[in-house]
């Protein structure tokens, strides 16, 4: 049983949490903290950033935070301690950085079977998190 669980999710993709959330609950010790993480991709280095209005990334982070709060209210009302977090940047790095900052005992992350050539060659976000994590990672398919 774990006391501080980090669950990275993508609100636009229910498969990122539909199976992982019950698993995160299942490995939680009584009174555990469940931390939900959403990530806004870094657009600063991308060519598209020059076409976006000023403050677009900040607005995206605020919108994501509001969505995560709604998600937590709908799905975690019975959890004693839950918090939502928004990170910014490359997904695997943001997950690992947040886990370090929180001192998470475990990362519970959804993965999907590789379904395209890029995923097979480069690897999924879950694969990168597993490779570089300094704490247990529970991958849910």
Label every PLM stretch briefly.
Residues 28-29, 76-77, 134:
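Short conserved AdoMet
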Residues 35-37, 83-87, 138:
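General small-molecule cofactor/ligand-binding pocket signal
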Residues 1-19, 79, 131-141:
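Intrinsically disordered or low-complexity boundary/linker segments at protein termini
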């Amino acid at each position: 049983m774990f006391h501080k669980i980090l669950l990275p999710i993508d609100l636009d993709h229910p498969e990122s949490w539909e199976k992982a959330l019950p698993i995160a609950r299942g490995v939680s010790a009584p009174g555990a903290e469940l931390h939900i993480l959403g990530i806004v991709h870094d657009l600063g280095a991308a060519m598209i950033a020059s076409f976006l209005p000023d403050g677009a990334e900040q607005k995206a982070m605020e919108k994501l935070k509001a969505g995560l709060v709604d998600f937590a209210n709908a799905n975690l009302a019975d959890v004693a301690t839950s918090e939502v977090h928004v990170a910014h940047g490359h997904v695997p790095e943001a997950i690992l950085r947040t886990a370090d900052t929180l001192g998470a005992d475990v990362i519970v992350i959804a993965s999907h079977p590789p379904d395209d050539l890029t995923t097979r060659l480069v690897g999924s976000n879950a694969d990168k998190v597993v490779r570089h994590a300094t704490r247990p990672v529970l991958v849910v398919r």
